[in-house]
Structure formats: C-alpha cells, structure tokens
C-alpha cells in the first residue's frame, strides 16, 4: 500500500495539531506539525506566542522547515505523514502549500488536503488557551485578527475536505479524514 500525505490547513487555533494527533493515532501516520520544525529556532530566541516573530527569525524557521520537507521526502514507503500549516492567502502561502503537495508527488503518495475552518471569535478564544504555551504558538487574539485580516487564508483546493472545527470534535474530524483513505 502506498503512503499518504495528509495536509491539514487552517488558521491559528483551528485545531490542526489536535486533529493531527487523533489522526496519527487512527492511521499510524507521523505527525509533522509546523511547530515541530519552526520551534527549533523560535524557542532558543524566546518566542512566547505573544511578541511578534521578527523577519530574520521567520527566515531561519523557513530554512529548518525546508530541511524537514527534505527529510520527509526520504521517508520509507510504508510511512505516511501528516503536515499541519496555516497558509496565507497570498503567493507565499500558495507556494508553501505546493511544497507539501510536492512531497506527496515525490514520494508517490496519496495527497489528502484538508481545510480546517472555524469562526474568528472561536479562534480568538482558543489562541488564548494555556495549552498553547507548550509551543511557540500565536497566543494573542489581537495578533490573530491582524494576521487573518492582513494575509487571509489560502483558498481551498478543488476537492479538498472541508471541516468546521468549531462544530466538529477533534476525534470526529480525524475519523472523517481517515475515512478518505479507506474509501
């Protein structure tokens, strides 16, 4: 059986990592959430999710992320992967999303794009939750609104699975995603 590359796309606070953890438990896929890579440089800097990440540090995070994608391409054929990301609605966001799809193509893996959506007020509530302190995740509701207003979200691909995580519990969302590879 060929591997699967799941691509969970959504704004900060939409539950990408939480859904990804449930999906990993259901499928055995490796969870490669965006903070796994970027926190390698964000944490030494002291990023706390409240103060903005300077452009120089974002560039370092992008370099580490690129190395992670390179390693993902080298995975054995029996390894499926779950990537999580917030892709902005601009050329950079589209290019980043394409890089993850390219991993699937290079690995001859099935590509399953999933858009996680949630109302902004619920996202704002979630980003302030204390469990987001474990990683250098955005934790400021005002910054969240600014990011979403300034850069938006990448438009969903045709045929992508759409899940409202404000109305769908994480385990149910993961079950819906896992069902894509059995149908």
Give the predicted meaning of each segment.
Residues 8:
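Hydrophobic anchor at the beta1->P-loop junction of P-loop NTPases
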Residues 11:
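P-loop (Walker A) phosphate-binding loop of NTP-binding proteins
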Residues 21-70:
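Conserved substrate/cofactor phosphate-moiety recognition/catalytic segment
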Residues 60-115:
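Glycine-rich phosphate-binding loop used to anchor ATP phosphates in small-molecule kinases
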Residues 105-128, 163:
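Conserved phosphate-donor/acceptor-positioning beta-strand/loop module used by diverse small-molecule
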Residues 125, 129-176:
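Small-molecule kinase domains that catalyze NTP-dependent phosphoryl transfer to phosphate-bearing small molecules
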């Amino acid at each position: 059986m060929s591997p699967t590359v799941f691509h969970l796309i959504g704004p900060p606070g939409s539950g990408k990592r939480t859904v990804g953890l449930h999906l990993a438990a259901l499928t055995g896929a490796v969870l490669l959430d965006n903070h796994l890579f970027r926190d390698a440089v964000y944490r030494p800097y002291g990023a706390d999710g409240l103060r903005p990440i300077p452009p120089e540090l974002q560039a370092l995070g992008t370099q580490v992320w690129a190395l992670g994608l390179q390693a993902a391409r080298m995975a054995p054929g029996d390894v499926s992967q779950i990537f999580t990301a917030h892709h902005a609605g601009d050329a950079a966001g589209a290019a980043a999303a394409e890089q993850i799809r390219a991993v699937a193509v290079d690995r001859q893996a099935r590509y399953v794009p999933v858009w996680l959506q949630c109302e902004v007020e619920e996202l704002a509530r979630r980003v302030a939750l204390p469990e987001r302190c474990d990683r250098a995740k955005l934790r400021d509701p005002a910054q969240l609104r600014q990011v979403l207003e300034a850069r938006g979200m990448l438009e969903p691909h045709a045929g992508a699975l759409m899940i409202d995580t404000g109305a769908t519990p994480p385990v149910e969302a993961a079950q819906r995603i896992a069902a894509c590879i059995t149908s």
